[in-house]
Amino acid sequence: MQLNVNGAQAIEVSDATFGGEFNETLVHQAVVAYMAGGRQGTKGQKSRSDVSGGGKRPWRQKGTGRARAGTTRGPIWRGGGVTFAASTRNHDQKLNKKMYRAALRSILAELVRTDRLVVVEDFAVEAPKTKALLSKLNGLGLNDVLIVSDAVDQNLYLAARNLPHVDVRDVQGSDPVSLIAYEKVLVTVSAVKKFEELLG
């Protein structure tokens, strides 16, 4: 299949990478797994068994007229433990490399199908100036955009850092969440070749 390049001749790309079917279930699984992997999960509360003290029963079993109590660290006591105490846990979800790559191929194919993928010959700014980057993006009619190049350009990264709706990634730093989060994805021809190399 062919991909149109902005201001240049169309390029031939692999059907397997850019022309496949959209697998919503797989993409959803990849997004959930990616976001779960970013969770810290270091919460912690103490249950009745974790709270210090409470070994001695507060009063005898019978004869006081009060409800029986074996410890002062039960959940209904002040200073007691939490009923269903949260504990530190690992939220990671396993996703096979083959499935992850298939999800990325599916996303790229959908971006092409919905005209959200903009391909350019090259994209760079001479200095790390936000104004210069905005001018280039406005020239292409782009506002909410992810810029993907084959390698991170420091000037481009610094110029985009202060723009809330613009992000810069290299091909290997692209993930399912960032690829679907923006209105448009701007890729260079070299990045397209790199995607084919990694996902083909």
UniProtKB/Swiss-Prot annotation:
One GO MF term attached to the UniProt entry: rRNA binding
Region (Disordered): 38-73
GO BP: translation
Subunit architecture: Part of the 50S ribosomal subunit.
Role summary: One of the primary rRNA binding proteins, this protein initially binds near the 5'-end of the 23S rRNA. It is important during the early stages of 50S assembly. It makes multiple contacts with different domains of the 23S rRNA in the assembled 50S subunit and ribosome.
Gene that specifies this protein: rplD
GO cellular component terms, A-Z: ribonucleoprotein complex; ribosome
Record family assignment: Belongs to the universal ribosomal protein uL4 family.
Protein name in the entry: Large ribosomal subunit protein uL4
Domain of life the protein comes from: Bacteria
InterPro entries membership: Ribosomal_uL4, Ribosomal_uL4-like, Ribosomal_uL4_dom_sf
One Pfam family linked to the record: Ribosomal_L4
HAMAP family per the UniProt record, alphabetical: Ribosomal_uL4_B (MF_01328_B)
Keywords: Ribonucleoprotein, Ribosomal protein, RNA-binding, rRNA-binding
